[in-house]
From Swiss-Prot:
Its main location: cytoplasm. It is an enzyme of class 3 (hydrolase). This is Phosphatidylinositol-3,5-bisphosphate 3-phosphatase MTMR3. One of its GO terms (cellular component) is cytosol.
Amino acid sequence: MDEEMRHSLECIQANQIFPRKQLIREDENLQVPFLELHGESTEYVGRAEEAIIALSNYRLHIKFKESLVNVPLQLIESVECRDIFQLHLTCKDCKVIRCQFPTFEQCQDWLKRLNNAIRPPGKIEDLFSFAYHAWCMEVYASEKEQHGDLCRPGEHVTSRFKNEVERMGFDMNNAWRISNINEKYKLCGSYPQELIVPAWITDKELESVAGFRSWKRIPAVIYRHQSNGAVIARCGQPEVSWWGWRNADDEHLVQSVARACASDSQSSISKVSTRNSCRDFPNAGDLSDVEFDSSLSNTSGAESLALQPQKLLILDARSYAAAVANRAKGGGCECPEYYPNCEVVFMGMANIHSIRRSFQSLRLLCTQMPDPGNWLSALESTKWLHHLSVLLKSALLVVHAVDRDQRPVLVHCSDGWDRTPQIVALAKLLLDPYYRTIEGFQVLVEMEWLDFGHKFADRCGHGEDSDDLNERCPVFLQWLDCVHQLQRQFPCSFEFNEAFLVKLVQHTYSCLFGTFLCNNAKERGEKQTQERTCSVWSLLRAGNKAFKNLLYSSQSEAVLYPVCHVRNLMLWSAVYLPCPSPSTPTDDSCAPYPVPGTSPDEPPLSRLPKTRSFDNLTTTCENMVPLASRRSSDPSLNEKWQEHGRSLELSSFASAGEEVPAMDSLRKPSRLLGGAELSVAAGVAEGQMENILQEATKEESGVEEPTHRGHTEVPEVKEEAPLAKESSMAAEGPVVLYQEPQLDDATLRSHQGPSLSLFSQGIPEHQDGHNVLSSSLQAPLRGEDSQEVPVEQPQVENIAEDRENVAPAVPVDAKVGLGISQSSSLLPSQVPFETRGPHINNSVHMLLEDKVKSESGPQLHHRPCPASSGRFSGKDMLPVAPEPRSAERPQWDSVLHRTSSPGNTLSLLQAPCALPLDKCRQGIVCNGALETENKASEQPAGFDTLQKYPTPNGHCANWEAGRSKDSLSHQLSATSCSSAHLYSRNLHHKWLNSHSGRPSTTSSPDQPSRSHLDDDGMPVYTDTIQQRLRQIESGHQQEVETLKKQVQELKSRLESQYLTSSLRFNGDFGDEVTSIPDSESNLDQNCVSRCSTEIFSEASWEQVDKQDTEMTRWLPDHLAAHCYACDSAFWLASRKHHCRNCGNVFCSSCCNQKVPVPSQQLFEPSRVCKSCYSSLHPTSSSIDLELDKPIAATSN
C-alpha cells in the first residue's frame, strides 16, 4: 500500500516537477506558430526580418514567408552574431541557420536567449526528454488507461542478449559460457553485465586480463557466424607502454577464443553431418566405425584444445604509428611474438579529432552557395568520403575473414568505444540479414553502441556540464552515413528506408527520447532513464509503415560485399544539405508546365501577383480584379500544402469507401476551363519529380489525384464494369440529390445578381493550370446589403431547431443539385461550394429541410452535359460536395443560423465552360432532365465527377467535387468517417493523434500548418521513390479489395438464387416475397412493390442463433499486447481500441470504422473492426432491385 501511494504521489507531482514557463511575446498579436508537444512550453515569440521566431524548452522555430526552420535546441552546437544584425546558428548535423533581425538590440537579445538555451545541462533532468515523458504519463493517467509500456522498446530489445545467444547458436556446453563477472558493473562500468567468453576461462583470469586492457575492457565475443562458427570479439587496447608489459592470462584468453571457435564449429559441423547422414543415407550401415564415431563426435573442453584452430585476426583500427605513439600514454598494441597463431592488421582509421575537423570542413562546404564551381574538389578536400571508405574497408576485411576464411576476429582501437563499434556493427550488418531488419537494427544499436559504452553524452554534447569541445565528434553519425551508403548499393536488402536513418540522426541529438542519454549503461541505470524517458524505438518501431522499405526482400543476399571506393560513395544530401528543409510552394522553385495553346503575349506563368491576406482578396474582389492568379505561398493556402507531398504516399483512391475500376478503365484527357489539356496539378514546390509522380499515379490508378492546396483540378471520369458499379453501393451511404429547374437564357438574365456579373467579368478565359474558382471562392459571404456575414461558432442545437422551423421557400424541383451524404448533412464543414452567393440562406435551409424529407420523398437526379467535355456517355453522375477550407468554415457555420426570407432567391457563383450554352445543350439540357429511376448504382463509389450548370453569361459552369481535408479530430467526431470525401489523411498523423492526444488549434496567418512538421516536432522527410512504391502497393491492394467485393457479391447472388429456387420448390413463399419478381420486371416508377424497403433480398431470412441474443464479452486490456488483426504491438502511439461487436482489441487503423451494433444494444454508430464492419454494414441487394427510397445505412 505504501508503495502504491508513493507511485500515486509521483504521478500527481509529475508535471509540477516540470512546470510550464510564462510566454513572453514581443508583440501581443503574435501566437505560437507550431503545435507544442507534451511538456513543451514556448518561452519567447518575436519577429525577425520577414519572419516569426519562437523559442521553447525543446526547439527553435523560425517561420519565414516561404519556408520554416524547426530545430531542437540540443541539435544546435553554437550561436554567434555576424554582420551586427544576423545570427549564425551552427548545428550538429551539418546544417547552418541564418536569421536576420531589424535591430542590433533585438539580435543581441535573441543571442543571449539561445546561448542560455543550448548550454549543456547542469543536471540531466534539465533535458526535455524527462519533461516530455512526465507530461505524457500525466495525460495517460487522466485517461485511466495503462500506457507506461508504450514508451518502452519491444521485447526484442529488452531481452536482446538472451535472444541473440540463442539465435546465433553458441555452443554453451563445451565451447562458450556466459560470465557474470561484470554484474552491477563491478568490473567495467562501460561494459554490459553479461559477457560471452571461452568456457574454460575462469573469472579470476578475466580479472587479471581486465588489469591489462584499457579501461578494463576485456576481449568479449559479440557475434558468431551461424554456418561456420567463426566469431567476432571486441576489447580495448593492451597497456603495453614503453616498458613492453605482457600478461599471460590475456595471451591465453586471445588464443582460447580461436580454440573455442574451432570447437564450436566442429560441434556444429558434426550435428549437420549427422542430420545429413540420417536424411541422405537411410541405409547407413555401410559406414565404417571410424567414420560413424567421427560423425557423432562431441568433444569435451579438454579435447577441443587438441583441435587445430584457425589463425585469429587482430584488427587494430589505428595506424601502426598511432598505435606505437600510444605506448607513451600507457597503451600500445599486441606483439605478434607474444600472441602465436595471431595476425595483427592496422587499418589506419583517423581518430575523433581528425573526424571532427573533417566534419567541420564538410559543414562549411554545404553552407556555401548552392552551386560552387569547385564543388567536387572541395568535397574531396574535406576527406569525409575518404573516412567513410576506410571504415567500409575495415568492416569488409572482417567480413572476408569471418565468412570466406572462417577465421575469428578480434577488433579494438584505443579505448574501444568509438572506432571499434563502428567496425563491428558494420561487419555484423554485412554478415547477418537479421540486423538489416528494423528489429534487428535496433538490437544492433543497443548491443554494440549502448551496451558497450559509446560515449553519446560526450560525443553529442548533451551530457552534464559537457563543455569540452574536444570530446565532441559525430562518430555515430559517420556510422549511420555508412549504413546509408550500403542502402544505396543494396536497395532491396534493408527493411528500413532512408527516412528511418534520418529520424535516427535527428533524435541522436534532439533529446526528445532518452535512448542516447549518458555515456554508458551504468550511468543510464543510475539516472533511471529507461523508466523516466521514452525510447526512440517506440517511434521507429517495426510496425510504422513510414519507415519500411517497400523494395525490401528477405530473400536478398545473405552476406553483403559493398564497393568501398570513394568514387562509389555519395554525399548524404538528406542530412547534410539544406535542400530537404520544409518550404511552401513558390513560383521560383517550381513553375507549372506551359499550357498548349496559350498566347505568346500572355505574361509568363512563373511569376504571379502576390496577395497576402484574406482582406486583400476582398478588396481585390470589390475592385473587379481577376482573382485566379493568387499565389499558393499565402498562409491561408499553406495549410494543406505539406499534405501534397505526404498524400502521395497514399494512392489517389485511398479512401475506405471507394472502389477502383479494375476493368474497362478508359484513359481520357482532362481539360482546363480554357480548353487546354491538363497534364499535372499546379502548386507543387518540391520540383518536377512530384509532378511526374502525380502523373504516374493517374496512369497507374486511372483516377485523378485529389485537389491540393486550394487549387482545383478537373477530374477524369472513368467507366466501371457492371460488377464494380454494383459493389460500389455497398460501401457508400445514401446520397441525397436535388434537381435544379431548367432555366432558359431569359430566366437566367432576370435572376442575374451583382456578384454573378462581378465574377463572370473578372475571370479570364485562359488559366495556367489553376481552376478559376480556386481564388474567387476566397471572398467572404455577403448579404443583400453587401455586409459581411458575422463569424459564429456552430451550434448543433440551433441547427436542429432551424431545420424543424423552416418552411420550404421553393418547391423541391427548384432546388440545386447537391451531393450531400445523409449521415453527414448536419456537419457545417460539409456545406458545398455551389451554395456560395449573396442569397445563400435559402439553400442552406433547403438542405436542412430535405435532410428530413429525404427519407420519404422521391429522389431526383440531373444529367451532366456530355457535350462540353466529350467524356460523358449519358450516364448519371453523383456529385460529391467539396468542403471549404478551414479559414472559411466559420463563415459557413454562421450561415446555418440565418433565417430564411421569402424574397430571397438562389444564385450560384460559377465559372464559364469552354463551350457556349447553346452548343452545350445539343439534345440534352445542361442541368439535366428529371429522372424517374434511381441510378445511384451506376456511379462508381468514391469518384469525383464533373457537374455543369447554366450561368448568366451563356456558358456552362464546370464544377469539380473536391475531397474533404478535415482534420482527423473532426473526422472522428463526424458520423461518416469512412466516406470518400472525409477519409483522405496521411499515415503520419496516426502517430500524432494517438501519441499526443492534444486538442487541435485553429491556424492564423502567423500560424503555419502542422503538416510542415512531423509527429515528433521535426521537419517532414519525404522520399519520392518510396512514395511511388506506396502508390503502387495501395493500388494493388485496392484492386484486390475490389475483386474480393465482387466475388462476395457474386456469392451472395448465387446464394440468393439458390434460396429462391429452394423456397419456390417448397412452396414457402409469402405474399411479400412473391411480389419481388413482379417488381424486378416492372419498370413503372410508380409501382408500389418497387418502393418497398422491407425486403431487400431473398437471403434476408436467417435462423436466429442463441448467441445473437447474448452480450459480447470484451477482452481485458492487459491481456492484449498486439492488435488482433494486424498483430502490430501496442506502444506509445498505437492505442488499444475495443471492437463493440466482437470484443477483441485492435489498433486504430484496424478499428476505425463506425456502424450501429443492434445486437449489443448500440443503435448509434460505434467503433468496430474492419471484419465486423463488413458484416454489419448493409450491402446492396440485386442490381435489378432499384429503390426510390435510399437504404438506411451510415457511411462510416
